Amino acid sequence: MLVFLHAVFITVLILLLIGRLQLLERLLLNHSFNLKTVNDFNILYRSLAETRLLKVVLRVIFLVLLGFCCYRLLVTLM
């Protein structure tokens, strides 16, 4: 039961992190209007690529933990 609660807690934290990363991505895109040099665009491009990669990794971890939670719940109910 403790393992199940721990997995649920981490799943919720991952969802919150994904939401924060989406907010960060929107803020970075809003600041693209203020960029003046090519170096600024390169930094923005790298930052957006890193946030997108991090979102993908967190979503994969989220799906694995969600599957684990569902499996543990089914085992507990049987």
UniProtKB/Swiss-Prot annotation:
Chain residue ranges for the region called Interaction with PPP1CC/PP1-gamma: 59-65
Gene Ontology cellular-component terms listed: host cell membrane; membrane
Pfam family, one: Corona_7
Transmembrane segments: 58-78
Cellular compartment(s): Host membrane
Keywords on record: Host membrane, Membrane, Signal, Transmembrane, Transmembrane helix
Superkingdom as given in the UniProt entry: Viruses
Annotated InterPro entries: Corona_7
Main subcellular location of this protein, as a coarse class: host cell
Membrane topology recorded in Swiss-Prot or TrEMBL: Single-pass membrane protein
Quaternary context: Interacts with serine/threonine-protein phosphatase PPP1CC/PP1-gamma; this interaction; this interaction probably promotes EIF2S1/eIF-2alpha dephosphorylation.
Entry function: Inhibits the integrated stress response (ISR) in the infected cell by promoting EIF2S1/eIF-2alpha dephosphorylation. Acts as a functional homolog of host PPP1R15A/GADD34 to recruit PP1 phosphatase and dephosphorylate host EIF2S1/eIF-2alpha. May function in the formation of membrane-bound replication complexes or in the assembly of the virus.
Family as reported in the entry's similarity comment: Belongs to the coronaviruses ns7/ns7a protein family.
Protein name, per record: Non-structural protein 7
Organism annotation: Porcine transmissible gastroenteritis coronavirus (strain Purdue)
